[in-house]
Structures are given as structure tokens and as C-alpha cells.
Amino acid sequence: MRWTGPGSGARLEEDPTDDERSTMTDATNAGAAGTITIGELTVNRLGFGSMRLTGKGVWGPPDDHDESIRVLRRAVELGVNFIDTADSYGPYLAEDLIREALHPYRDDVVIATKAGLLRTGPDVWIPLGNPSYLRQEVEMSLRRLGVDRIDLHQLHRIDPNFPLEDQVGELATLQQEGKIRHIGLSEVDVDQLKAAQKVASIVSVQNLYNLTTRTAEALLDEAETQGIAFIPWFPLAAGPLADADGPLGSLAADHGASPSQLALAWLLKRSPVIVPIPGTSRVDHLEPNVAAAGIELTEEEFQAIDAATAGK
């Protein structure tokens, strides 16, 4: 079984237009988005995803190593204190970059990583939930990140070849051993979340969710009901909707912002448990992403965006 990631027709987080980069790039602090408590860890609701820091196909080193380091350091300067990564990004290289850029970590910085996807080449992702493999990857992430305990460890994918209870159960055992503080899940449905919660306390879920892909609505509603974090990956994939002459263009202009920034503002307004993690490999893309934390949509604007983009 292979997962090939987002479709090639969608816009990646690091592809804003020149016009987008010229709008609303003031150094807004990520704290403008408000905060959320994940377990007992309080973080700003605008995080950073490290997948785009690596090479093409999320494979190999970045094209510009020094710029990747600058991106991470600038993110923290701008108040981003929730950094999402995974053993499979690179593989391993994103975790290495995070340690190089940010270690020793500030007390308020939360590093969330994942395991459960095996990499054999660019754009190839193979679920592997063998409990012994998950344990091995947790141990290696501890070394790469330079920590004694991982703040949030997420099961990257549920492997159908192993019982869910065994996969989550191994993370629970590692938690009891003090190697993991909190456990999260990625790409699950409501039933899988509830099944996992019979084995361990789950504090977050991470699914594909954005203006144009809302198949995880039921999971988001469940996360909000339970008060656990919902981390949408690929949050800026809005395709043609992000074009200046698309449905978001006029409203974006009213805010002095870009359509992509409005897409982030919509997510932040959608639910108080949402923690977007837009990623990029360039500082000049990072800053407008963080600036979106300062955009406050009215309920009327939120509903207008919702109506214009639903089902697109």
C-alpha cells in the first residue's frame, strides 16, 4: 500500500505569487491567532510544518540549507511555538534541521513529530505500524531532536496490517516510560479516534483539511466536542480559489491581504481547536503566513468564504 501525497494540481504552501508576497507582510506575531492547550502545553494557534524544508518529493536535503535554518529561527522569532515534523520528512532531515536551528529549545517551544510511514524514495509513503518499528523510530527521533522526551508524538498513519490497538498501545507504553509526553493521530476517522482512545489518551488529530478539502468535517466536529487539537495539514491548498481574481480576491483586497492569507484566517475562524501549520522553505513566504494570524474575519465574511468555496 502506497500513499503518494497531495495531488499535483494543488498549490503547495510555498508557492505564493509575487502579489501575495507584497501584501500584509508586517511582522505580526503568531500569538495574534490566540492560543490552544494541547495536553497541558499551551501554544499559539498558528504553527509551522517542516515538510517543505526538505528536498523535492520530501526526499533528501533542502536546496538551500542555510535558508531552511533561517526559516525555523525566524518562525520562532515571530511567535511560532508549535513546530510539526516527522521522521519521514527527508527522511530524518527535517528533525536534524530543527535541532540545528533551535536547540537548545526555548521553554515555550513544542516540537511534535510522527512515525508510521516508511520512505523508499521521493513521494513514496508506505504505512508501517509494526510496534517494534514505531519504538525504533521514537528512539531515533529522541536522538535527532536532542530531547529526553517528545512533547507530542503522532501515529502518522494507521497500518491495516497491524491491530490499531497494538500501534497505539506501543506509543502508550513509550509514554509510560517517559519518552513521549502526549500522543496524537494522523489521517483517522471518528471511529478510529474513539478506538484509539480506548488504549491511550489522545490529545490531537492531524488530517488533510482546507477550504477545498473538507472530508474531515466529522472528525473536526468531534475534536471540537472533545476539546482536542485539530491540526490541518496542507492548509493553503486552495487551487484556483487562491488566485487574485478568484472567489477570495475581492475580500482579500479589502483586508490588504492575499487569498492564501484569507484561507488561513478562515481556518482559524472555523474552530477554536484548529492549529494550522503552513510550511515553507523561504523566509519571505513564512512572514505573510504568520501575518495571517492578525486577520480577523467577521461572521458575515466567514460565511461568505464558506459559501463561495464549499464543494469546489
Report residues per predicted region.
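Acidic (Asp/Glu)-rich catalytic clusters
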Residues: E40, E77, R99-V110, L142-G146, ...
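Conserved beta-strand positions
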Residues: F48, T85, T113, L152-L155, ...
